[in-house]
A protein has these predicted regions:
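Cross-kingdom Sec-pathway N-terminal secretion signals
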Residues: 2-47, 61, 70-73
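Active-site catalytic motif of lipid deacylating hydrolases and related acyltransferases
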Residues: 46-104
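Gly/Ala-rich beta-loop-alpha elbow adjacent to hydrolase catalytic centers
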Residues: 111-116, 120
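Flexible "cap/lid" loop of the alpha/beta hydrolase fold
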Residues: 129, 135-179, 217
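Conserved serine/cysteine hydrolase catalytic core
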Residues: 211-257, 262-266, 270-273
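Post-His helix in hydrolase/transferase enzymes
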Residues: 273-288
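A cross-kingdom C-terminal cell-surface attachment/processing module
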Residues: 302-325
Length: 327
């Protein structure tokens, strides 16, 4: 079942609390339960040209995590770019993506998983070509919020089991210099299956993903958002109901606040790995109709056409009755 929703909390937290939230930034697959009244996708914009789909990964992943989604979209004729997210700083990552978006001609459907959601939120602001935002178990921060703050809003993340630990217990922190807070964060191999995948993949695939994960700086999760694209661009949201990285309740909060067209999928944080079809279908919906859903607006083009047809039918019927009475 699919649901329509949208979601903001803002408080400065110590590094001990913020680091755990970092664990919320990856990409993955799922099974879907729908909530919402979005229109059926046509796979094209109003001009008939298919938009370019840009995919942005998050923490502990890389662009290859989108492979099956890329294949599925390309099979249907969509231009696709799976970008390499630097994972260094939110502003720097957003600037990097924004430059890529400016080089793309025509409409864009912008998709972010995990921390990638925070990046697309900042990068898309002010770009008229971005017609849809799609959050795949991703952060959708408001202005001045950080990813780590949002990850700590409600329980559900298993990035740490000791809130007083200097580094979240599921993470390894690798120093990048003399400053002890300047670290790269890795998800421990022995925690990867549970935290990132909810123990839903076979051991061989899990070990490959753990070995090839890309780290992110703690600074990237601590940097406040400056631009909020979901306030002006229609958004879609996939909520993973077994998300142990960001936490399912945190996903629901953000989706509801953003008034996103939302689906809930029985899946882990790494939804693309377990449920690529559900991810693909939501992207296709966003690509097919970038307007807000009927539940939000109360009307759409199809409703207007049907309403017009109904009015004509009633008018014609009335005329027939009048003529019959006169003859």
């Amino acid at each position: 079942m699919k649901h329509i929703r949208r979601t903001a909390a803002l408080r400065v937290l110590p590094l001990t609390v913020l680091l755990p939230a970092a664990a919320l930034l990856t990409a993955g697959p799922c099974l879907a339960s729908e909530s919402g009244g979005g229109t059926t996708p046509t796979g094209a914009t109003s001009t008939g040209a298919k938009p370019t789909v840009v995919l942005v990964h998050g923490y502990w992943a890389d662009a290859s995590g989108w492979d099956r989604i890329v294949q599925a979209l390309q099979t249907q004729g969509y231009p696709v770019v799976a970008t390499a997210n630097p994972l260094r700083s939110l502003s720097g990552d957003a600037d990097y993506l924004a430059a890529q978006l400016k080089a793309i001609e025509g409409p864009i459907v912008l998709v972010g998983h995990s921390y990638g959601g925070a990046v697309i939120t900042n990068a898309a602001a002010g770009n008229p070509n971005v017609e849809s935002l799609v959050y795949i178990a991703g952060f959708a921060p408001d202005k001045d919020e950080t990813a780590f703050q949002l990850a700590a809003k409600y329980p559900g993340s298993r990035v740490t089991d000791d809130p007083n630990a200097p580094v979240p217990t599921a993470l390894n922190a690798v120093p990048l210099g003399g400053d002890p807070t300047n670290v790269d964060l890795y998800l421990k191999p022995e925690k990867f299956a549970d935290v990132f995948l909810s123990n839903r993949l076979d051991a061989a695939r899990t070990q490959v993903l753990a070995a090839t994960q890309r780290p992110a700086t703690a600074a990237s999760g601590n940097e406040p958002t400056q631009s909020v694209a979901w306030k002006t661009i229609p958004s879609w949201y996939l909520i993973a109901t077994d998300d142990r990285t960001i936490g399912t309740d945190n996903l629901r909060f953000m989706a509801k606040r953003a008034k996103a067209t939302t689906i809930e999928v029985n899946a882990p944080h790494a939804v693309m790995e377990t449920n690529p079809d559900d991810v693909t279908q939501l992207i296709l919906k966003a690509a097919g109709d970038a307007r807000p859903s009927l539940a939000e607006t109360g009307t759409d083009q199809r409703t207007a056409l049907l309403g017009g047809a109904a009015a004509l039918t009633v008018a014609a019927g009335t005329a027939i009755v009048i003529r019959a009475r006169r003859t």
